[in-house]
């Protein structure tokens, strides 16, 4: 499986404050990668470095195996992103906002692309309603629509479910899963809401105090999350027999000599 993003030893400081410290992570093609961390952990700073809105003090970032400056611009053309909040014009409709971005990106067959994109994100019936009057969920969907115009291979979303109501969160989740499964887009999503990332992602990076302290798969995550009972006994053989034959529980002997 190809590597979409690989980061090694990334460090970023603002003044004397270390925001990212020797951070490393890997995202493979087809992943929905959940970047989990509390507010202030460095998620947005990391995403801005990946998209070259900020530059690291140390470390390497490889995007689609590109590290050199002349390759990086081409690699970034394969990336769509919504960072912090969607960038759209308040007094334009959804269609007009996409038309504007098609013009500045020189996207051919703009009208067809716009209608297909609006339909895909569920905004085809917004009519003359302008962005200023959109609900938060609609604004997030328009932000994703703008990111999708260039048909990206890699989509980066920074805290996209903040402030959404339960229905909006569910609709967002289904849309992201469709993008991944139907269009094959690799996706990086940051959030501080672990319960929602768990329902979306297949791999997780846990960010704490500027470091990725662990990268785990969903299967590993589920194993770590299992409830268990620690049972101490002086009669190991009898306890194993009861658990297996009478209670029919899965168990593991972790200290056979004691």
Predicted segment positions?
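Short, solvent-exposed coil/turn segments
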Residues: 20, 28, 224-226, 256
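A generic structural signal for secondary-structure junctions
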Residues: 64, 106, 205, 217, ...
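Short, flexible turn/loop "capping" segments at secondary-structure junctions
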Residues: 55, 220-224, 253-256
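Short, charged/small-residue-rich alpha-helical element at the C-terminal edge
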Residues: 227-258
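A structural detector for beta-sheet-dominated domains
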Residues: 8, 28, 231-234
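Conserved beta-strand-loop-alpha-helix hinge in the C-terminal portion
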Residues: 211-234
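Primarily ABC-family ATPase nucleotide-binding module
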Residues: 1-3
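ABC transporter nucleotide-binding domains
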Residues: 5, 12-23, 27-189, 194-208, ...
């Amino acid at each position: 499986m190809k590597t979409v993003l690989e980061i090694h030893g990334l460090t970023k400081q603002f003044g004397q404050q270390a925001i990212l410290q020797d951070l490393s992570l890997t995202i493979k093609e087809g992943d929905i990668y959940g970047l989990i961390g509390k507010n202030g952990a460095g998620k947005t700073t990391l995403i801005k470095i990946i998209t070259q809105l900020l530059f690291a003090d140390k470390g390497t970032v490889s995007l689609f195996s590109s590290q050199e400056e002349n390759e990086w611009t081409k690699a970034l053309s394969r990336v769509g992103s919504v960072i912090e909040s969607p960038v759209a014009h308040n007094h334009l409709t959804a269609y007009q906002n996409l038309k504007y971005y098609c013009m500045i990106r020189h996207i051919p067959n703009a009208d067809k692309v716009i209608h297909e994109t609006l339909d895909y994100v569920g905004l085809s019936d917004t009519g003359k309603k302008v962005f200023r009057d959109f609900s938060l969920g609609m604004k997030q969907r328009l932000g994703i629509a703008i990111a999708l115009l260039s048909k990206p291979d890699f989509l980066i979303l920074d805290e996209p479910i903040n402030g959404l109501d339960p229905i909006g969160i569910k609709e967002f989740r289904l849309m992201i899963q469709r993008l991944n499964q139907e269009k094959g887009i690799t996706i990086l999503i940051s959030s501080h809401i672990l319960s929602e990332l768990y329902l979306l992602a297949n791999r997780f990076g846990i960010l704490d105090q500027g470091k990725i302290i662990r990268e785990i798969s969903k299967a590993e995550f589920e194993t770590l999350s299992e409830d268990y009972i620690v049972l101490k006994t002086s009669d190991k053989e009898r306890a194993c027999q009861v658990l297996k034959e009478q209670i029919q529980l899965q168990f593991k002997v972790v200290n056979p000599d004691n």
